[in-house]
Curated annotation (Swiss-Prot):
Domain of life: Eukaryota
Main subcellular location: nucleus
Presence of the UniProt keyword DNA damage in the record: no
Protein's UniProt name: Histone H2B.3
Organism: Zea mays
Coiled coil as UniProt keyword: no
CC annotations in GO: nucleosome; nucleus
Pfam families the UniProt entry points to: Histone
Modification after translation, per record: Can be acetylated to form H2BK6ac and H2BK33ac.
Subcellular location: Nucleus; Chromosome
Swiss-Prot/TrEMBL keywords: Acetylation, Chromosome, DNA-binding, Isopeptide bond, Nucleosome core, Nucleus, Ubl conjugation
Compositional bias annotation for Basic and acidic residues: 1-28
Length: 153
């Protein structure tokens, strides 16, 4: 702390010659270089460049997960059971993997039939191809129910 005390009087002498606002700026500048690096992203974006702040918010929003929905289903099935963050991450990866497999299979089916659009029929067929046995039957029935509910509303 002694070296900091030595620096302050040196900073005060030029500050006494200059306006008091520079004195306030010089003292925190020596103390908070890390804080200044962190804060301008929030402060300068809010005051001057709103685009920088919005850009960062958009980057955070682009990360989409199924964590909320996994948790809701867990609470419907087992209200008294929780889930760790690692298990949640594994479940999220699992759902993303299944989604990618279904999307790829649906796209192949549309290409084979020379159709430009992936419809519910391609999705249903890809579910039957990707998922095994009883799981495929349940998935098809739930999917059909969801599509019916969507079209009726």
């Amino acid at each position: 702390m002694a070296p900091k005390a030595d620096k302050k009087p040196a900073a005060k002498k030029p500050a006494e010659e200059e306006p008091a606002t520079e004195k306030a700026e010089k003292a925190p500048a020596g103390k908070k270089p890390k804080a200044e690096k962190r804060l301008p992203a929030g402060k300068s974006a809010g005051k001057e460049g709103g685009e920088g702040k919005k850009g960062k918010k958009k980057a955070k929003k682009s990360v989409e997960t199924y964590k909320i929905y996994i948790f809701k289903v867990l609470k419907q099935v087992h209200p008294d059971i929780g889930i760790s963050s690692k298990a949640m991450s594994i479940m999220n990866s699992f759902i993303n993997d299944i989604f990618e497999k279904l999307a790829a299979e649906s796209a192949k089916l549309a290409r084979y039939n020379k159709k430009p659009t992936v419809t519910s029929r391609e999705i249903q067929t890809s579910v039957r191809l990707v998922l095994p046995g009883e799981l495929a039957k349940h998935a098809v029935s739930e999917g059909t129910k969801a599509v019916t509910k969507f079209t009726s509303s």
